[in-house]
Amino acid sequence: MKDPAVEIEKLREQLHHHEHLYYVLDKPEITDAEYDALMHRLQELETKHPDLLTPDSPTQRVGGKPREGFIKVRHSSPMLSLDNALNEAELRDFDRRVRDLLGGAAFRYVTELKMDGLSMAAHYNNGKFTEAVTRGDGTTGEDVTENARTIRSLPLRVKTKLPAFEVRGETVMSRRAFERLNTDRDEKGLSRFANPRNAAAGSLRQLEPQVTASRRLEYYTYFLLTEGRPAYESHWEALTALKQMGFKVNDKSRPCDSIDEVLAFCAHWEGERENLPYEIDGVVVKVDSVEQQRRLGFTAKAPRWAIAYKYPARQATTMIEGIDVQVGRTGALTPVANLKPVVVGGVTVSRATLHNEDEIERLGLQIGDEVVVERSGDVIPKVVRVSSQGSYRKPFKMPSHCPVCNTKIVREEGEAASRCINANCPARLKESILHFASRGVMNIDGMGDALVDQLVDREIVHNIADLYDLKIEDLMDLDRMGVKSAGNVIRNIDKSRRNSLPRVLTALGIRFVGERTAVFLAQAFGSMDAIERATVDELQQAEEVGPKVAEAVVQFFSIPDNRELVDRLRKADLQFTYAYSRPKGGPLTGSTFVLTGTLPNLSREEAKQLIEQAGGKVASAVSKKTSYVVAGEDAGSKLDKAHQLNIRVITEAELHAMLRGE
């Protein structure tokens, strides 16, 4: 019989190894299912042998019970801020000061991307993670140990000869995780986070560690200390050691032998910053030698041996000269500010979104006001706030009729957007075609704004289905269209006929039906015809389809013009059927589960994956077709409904037993 302590330790070693490969090196060696199997075997053993549970176990990453507040902790040595260099001249001044203070001695720099997140120190004893503290005021921070434990790229144990040490680094949220988080908050009716930095800071300081665990934070290290002092004689050596110990270190960091090399590094990443998976706001430049750092010393607030080269601000102040209204593919009217041109983050900006009428009212904004404009990535710039009211300000009023087709606009109760309800509005048609042809939908390369404008304005295309009737000669007389480019567009249109039913559903532009919902509808019904005939109640049996989505689908197919459009697309040989079969033979085949509350060890997503891998189905709402409700702490109305419908309620432990076929 196996010694459980030995098996537990072996499982922990395996899981730590695979977490490092996946979350730090991005080089996984096993599948998610294999990782889950190891994790759940460890959870099973720790449940049976609670005396063997330790804080550094991978199972403890999911987060513990909510806290009442954060304890203040004094840092082993101050986490100082850095002086800033805002241009090349200031960076060269820094270099001159360093050379003067070092008396002409040879030295080199290390350059690191300045990641835009929340600074945090993590402490280890005998290779095991023990404590995490935010930067705070630089002298004292907040104990966020339980929240930090949920960050997968922060190792809970490392192999090292150092008996006790501290790492310092930046807690960040990737652009992708940020977009997912805001999309999720939109669906729940919650306010959006302004930027990834705010999202990372708010996530790390959650009173409920399980919320932090769901936010996909990452931790990049840049300092290694023992007893509050650098552990190695060069900064580059310390970064190398951190990598070898299993910490995530930004792989863009470089040693530089001169200030010209430093400036070249800064210029390169300023041009590439929008292509990075995370946000940066500059470059940190450090003298590499720790001995030379000591000689250079500190000012009252910052080290003399390091500086932050800040990229141009992505906020600027300018004046609103007017407000236009744009019409989207769903008919939503969006007010857009016409700005006095201003450079924001190196790009000249003359327009910025105002989102909707409520946002204008919230900002207290009028034409003629001075406003702060922010630009982030490829997203259209937005107005953040009014900085000063104009002397001759003029209030904006949303038009009562569509600015393109003059149809009376409608604003439904509970909605922020006003809408043009004319399905034949030229502006709506243009946006619908662009959506239909976009990457990730029907992916018709070459179908851009300029071509779509001409197709609609010259009345060559009256609806989406007309695209499949186009011939090369229809495009030949259009601006910037030759035989070759016209042929490419026609070939790409033809190739799009092979796209799957979920893509076709997404392309139709039905309200609330995005890529994910389209997949669930295709899986549940198998064909466009079945979806078109389905009732609101029947549609809600599909995974993650609630009343709002179901009603939108039924409403779409109730409109004769939409049914005619779908019929024409069917005749154009688009894919209207979908072959999908759920995993068969699993222990949960035929059962539908609903998850509610906070589970002890599994996140919602982890539980969902396990159920589906075992052949089961996870629904978002409790109904008569629900087989089991898996309830954790703080279960809400779903638990009450389960009791009302006499549906069996089970714990996470019972779910694990069912997964094992018991």
Curated annotation (Swiss-Prot):
Cofactor(s) listed: Mg(2+); Mn(2+)
Entry's EC annotation: 6.5.1.2
BP terms from Gene Ontology: DNA repair; DNA replication
UniProt binding sites for NAD(+): 32-36, 81-82, 112, 135, 170, 286, 310
Residue span, BRCT domain: 583-662
Catalytic activity line of the entry: NAD(+) + (deoxyribonucleotide)n-3'-hydroxyl + 5'-phospho-(deoxyribonucleotide)m = (deoxyribonucleotide)n+m + AMP + beta-nicotinamide D-nucleotide
PANTHER family named among the record's database cross-references: CHROMOSOME TRANSMISSION FIDELITY FACTOR 18 (PTHR23389), REPLICATION FACTOR C SUBUNIT 1 (PTHR23389:SF6)
Function: DNA ligase that catalyzes the formation of phosphodiester linkages between 5'-phosphoryl and 3'-hydroxyl groups in double-stranded DNA using NAD as a coenzyme and as the energy source for the reaction. It is essential for DNA replication and repair of damaged DNA.
Official protein name in the record: DNA ligase
Species in which this protein is naturally found: Solibacter usitatus (strain Ellin6076)
UniProt lineage: Bacteria, Pseudomonadati, Acidobacteriota, Terriglobia, Bryobacterales
